Each structure stands twice: as C-alpha cells, then as structure tokens.
Amino acid sequence: MLKYELLTTDGLARRGRMTLNHGVVETPIFMPVGTYGAVKAMSPAELKDIGAQIILGNTFHLWLRPGLEVMDAHKGLHGFNGWDKPILTDSGGFQVFSLGDLRKITEDGVTFASPINGDKLFLSPEISMQIQRRLNSDIVMQFDECTPYKIGDRPATEAEAAASMRMSLRWAQRSRNEFEREKNPNALFAIVQGGMFENLRDESLAGLQAIDADAGGEGFGGYAIGGLSVGEPKEDMMRVLQHVAPRLPADKPHYLMGVGTPEDLVAGVAAGVDMFDCVMPTRNARNGWLFTRFGDIKIKNAVHRNDPRPLDETCGCYTCSNFSRAYLHHLQRVGEILGARLNTIHNLYYYLELMAEMRTAIESHGFAAFQARFAADRARGAL
C-alpha cells in the first residue's frame, strides 16, 4: 500500500507524506543504507533516536546471504532485523551491473557467478519481484539494467544507452506483471534510465507512464531516477537530474538513487526530489570523514589531537553532546570500534537533520533562503 500526499511546494521543492504498510514517512527524506539488513554500526533503536523513518535493504546481497529460507522463517526482513518502520529494497540490478565481466545480460535476465562461492546464478525481473515479496519490503524497486557511464574506457554512446534503457522498460513491464501476479500488498517503484541523454530519459519516462496508465494509474507507486552517480562528471549528473525530476508525475514520490553529498541532497530537493539514499555518511564515518554544518572534518588529522570542542557546536547528536574532537581523533587513530559508531551516529544525524531543516523551509516557503544559508555555512569551513 502507498498513499502519497503532496502537502506544499516552494518552487520545485516538495513537502510530502508517504503512508506505507509499516508507517508514515515525511518527505523529503534520506534513507540510511542497510546492505545486509543492518545499517553499519547502528541498532534499530539508535536509528529511531536520530530520526530515521525508512531504511534501505539490498535484495541481491540478502538473497545470497542469509538466503530466503531465513527470511521466510522471520516472515520477512522486518522480523529478521528488528526494524518495524518502512523498508525500501533495491532490485539487485545495480549490484549485478557492478559485477562487470562476471555477468552476462540477455533479454531473459542476468546470469552471473556468485561473488561468494562462484556458483552460477540467474536473476530476472520475475525472480527479483519474488525475492522482494518474501523480504516484504514496503517499497519494491523494478528490476532494471543500470546504464553505465563508461563502457571500457569511453562514455556509453547514445545507441548503447538507448538499448539499455529500452531493455529496462521491457523489464519494468515484466516487473509490474509479476508484482501483480504475486498480489504484493506493498508499493512498486519504476526507474527512469537513459544515461546522459535527455531524449532517452524522456522516452524512458513516457514508457513507464504508459505502463502506469495501463494499470489505471496504479502501476507504479513512485518514480526513481537511476543511472546517476555512476562515474559521470558532476555537471552531467546535475544536468540530467534537473531535466528529469521536474517531469516526474507530481502526484507520486520522486526518488534519486545512490546520491549523495549534502550539496547533492539540497540540489536534488531544489529540483523536486523527495527521497535519497547513499552509503556516503556511513562509509565516510568509518573512514573518519565527518560532515558538519560548516564543512567537513577529517578527524584523523593532527590538528584535532588536543581540540576539546565537539565536531559541531550546533549539532544535537549524542556524539557532539558528549565527546570532543580530541577523543574522536584518538579513537580513529587507535582503530577503536567505538569511534566508527560515534562517527556514524553523527554523520547520519547530520543528514537526517538536514532533511528535517529542508522540510521546515519548504513548509514556510523559505527554501531559497535556506539554500543560500546552507551554501554560505558549508563554504565557511569547519574551524
């Protein structure tokens, strides 16, 4: 089930609300990534404490480990990982795309060698829908081919991007058919592909909307923009984003997949995006790269060795409320697990608080002023 309400707009920025089978999600929102069913270093209770409303799970990896029998025994991913709020699962398409020479793509689906033990495996739109049904995720993503930015050492041609996009369109129809056959009570999202070519993005969106219309407007609960943040220059990413996002159906949520930096999130919301996911806040946290209102901090640098201040004096997270930069520097230097946990709490809190500030700014029709203040603060640098 998915109900989406567009509450207000400010320019292209949208303030909305999604009602899903496991709860309500206020948008725009950032979704922490839990690849193997867990957001790295975070318990479900800690995620709730910092304001997480929905998390992301990885269909491909959960299918391989722990496997579907384990999921069935727990009645899905919620029962397995103890998270009782909404979950979005990707389709597995991007992970298969990432295998490179280890996989073979045909019209039927993708044959590949398991990265765990080398077993020959096959994933198709139908199998992806069946896996996601057993995971019982609130938002199911269609199976797609993620059009690469580069093929070999050169950018993908328009013909190559077109062939990939049209395959994804055919797979979208098959995903929709299987989702319906499974009587899945959750929401299915479509994915707009087309590489760096605006005309192909338009063709992809038109094809997906035709599938949606054939189902009486109930074909897809939302629309995602895929195939960005895959190695392309930032200006190309922004060009495609700013072309596609305003053209997505206004009455359904818009999801920008796999993006990105705090600046990317603000630019995405300004273009009309409602949902984001990225491993950046958690991965960077483990590497000691921390986001603050006033720029980024590399906590391992010697300048922080004796610094008694918190990471960000304006931040209300557990880490900033209790620990100094010097302590976090020490934990990072000695490789203490607690350091990764405290860093992750802070980075995710920063991302989720940034989204909350944008929701408030849109509600008060002050988003342009928020953008200017955000850019000025981040440019100042963490002193």
Swiss-Prot record:
Active site: D90, D277
Complex and partners: Homodimer. Within each dimer, one monomer is responsible for RNA recognition and catalysis, while the other monomer binds to the replacement base PreQ1.
Superkingdom of the organism of origin: Bacteria
Any single Pfam family the record assigns to this protein: TGT
Cofactor: Zn(2+)
Alphabetized NCBIfam families for the sequence: Q_tRNA_tgt, tgt_general
An example Gene Ontology molecular-function term: metal ion binding
GO cellular component: cytosol
UniProt similarity note: Belongs to the queuine tRNA-ribosyltransferase family.
Protein name: Queuine tRNA-ribosyltransferase
Group of enzyme by EC: transferase
UniProt remark on cofactor binding: Binds 1 zinc ion per subunit.
Substrates-to-products reaction catalysed: 7-aminomethyl-7-carbaguanine + guanosine(34) in tRNA = 7-aminomethyl-7-carbaguanosine(34) in tRNA + guanine
InterPro entries: ArchSynthase1/Queuine_TRR (IPR050076), TGT (IPR004803), TGT-like_sf (IPR036511), tRNA_ribo_trans-like (IPR002616)
Region of interest: RNA binding: 258-264, 282-286
HAMAP family: Q_tRNA_Tgt
